[in-house]
Amino acid sequence: MSRTESEPHIVIVGGGFSGAAVALHLLRESRRALRISVVEPRPALGFGVAYSATDPAHRINVPAARMQLAGDDDGAFDRWYRRHGDFPQDPQAQLADGSVYPQRGAFGRYVQENLAQAIKAYSGSLTHIRERAAGWHDGCVITAEGQRLRADGLVLAVSHPPPRLPKVVQHVAQHPRLIANPWRAGALAAIPLNARVAIMGTALSMADVVASLHRQGHQGTTLAFSRHGLLSRANAPLAASAWQASYQTGTLRQRLRQIRADIPRAAAQGLPWQAVLDAVRSQGQTIWQQLTEAEKRQFLRHLRRFWDVHRYRIAPQVAQAIAEKRADGTFRSLAARLQALTVEGEVFCLQLAQRSGGTVWQEVDYLVLTTGPDHADLVASQPFLTALHQDGQIRPDALGMGIEVNAHSQAVGASSRIWVAGPAARGRFGELMGLPQVAEHARQVAQTVLQTLTSRQNVTA
């Protein structure tokens, strides 16, 4: 047996940020040589859906100083961006307080550079397999082109599942003016400057669509609607200090009451409400795992939509684009449900049932869907995950948020060699969508994989 064949082989399915971060920490922290294979069809690792964005209007949603890989020095990405990124060519990135909100692709390049450095600096090897994982058989990942990758450890770092096409629009699924995937390159470019646009969904993706239209010089009307009509809030200027408070005791209702009471207390100290929410976020995984199953379901049913629009905020530049369109009368939002959709020639006729009561009819030239990932159907969204599920290796979590895992992020199933990294594990950990949490989780998964490999080696030695 060759030295390479005797080295443990870790297969990572998914090469976006989560997968690249796991690979990086495996390389950095392993005390023995490893073979790492990352199965990812995109041409480069570390970008994924979020950081593959090429539209200059799409910016990172938090200041660069808060974007980093776990284990990096504070502000590492901010310093890299100012020295090596596109900072000189992007004057709009910097705000009056000195903070910078780079275009999203910059962070993907930062991750890619760190990964390349780790490959050179450490003893492990990394192979990027530009395919999709398609099947699973007898401990092997089978790619779409038939490669068989025997895995001593498998890490699922899968991307967000695609949105589910709402039933009310399925009969126009092939209509050229229905934009079901606004992330597709050039998807919005064909919209004329004076076209009337409706956007189904009012959260982060909607904000990106409006920012793109604004950058293109769109002058037509834009209507964004969702059942509750809640828009993502903007980030505040960097605060001089953080809000210090613990939210790790009490029932869900008691914690909510404390958070609400702390917002005016923080304001009295000159801190915005965002500082309080950031304190909650930093304790989010602990809080989530302390809640009862009934409280988790209560949160998902009644509070999640409010948490999401306050927790997952938009860059000030994006907020400004929305504000400008609202000020000139070309943007409005509505709390409404799409009851019916008809087509007359090239015009969509929307029948909207308002949350406040009554019905509104709206004619638009384009309908854009930004309803978000369909996490409840994650396992069914990819053939590889379906194969793992059918083999008893993984199963959906009980809350419909992703894949069921244990406290070590191991998939609950027939094997002890499968881990889940990133948002697909949030049914267990809760707060696992923001980059700082995903980065730290990736490091923890890498450490657990390495510890497991070491334990097996000691047993067989």
Give the ranges of each region predicted by the language model:
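Flavin (primarily FAD) cofactor-binding/catalytic cores of flavoenzymes
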Residues: S2-V49, Q92-G250, R257-S455, A461
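Dinucleotide-binding Rossmann-like beta1-alpha1 core, especially the glycine-rich loop
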Residues: D55-G71, G75, G85, D90-L115
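N-terminal glycine-rich dinucleotide-binding loop that anchors FAD/FMN and/or NAD(P) in oxidoreductases
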Residues: S52-R79, A240-R255, Q317-V318
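Short coil-to-beta-strand
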Residues: D74-Y81, G85, S415-V420
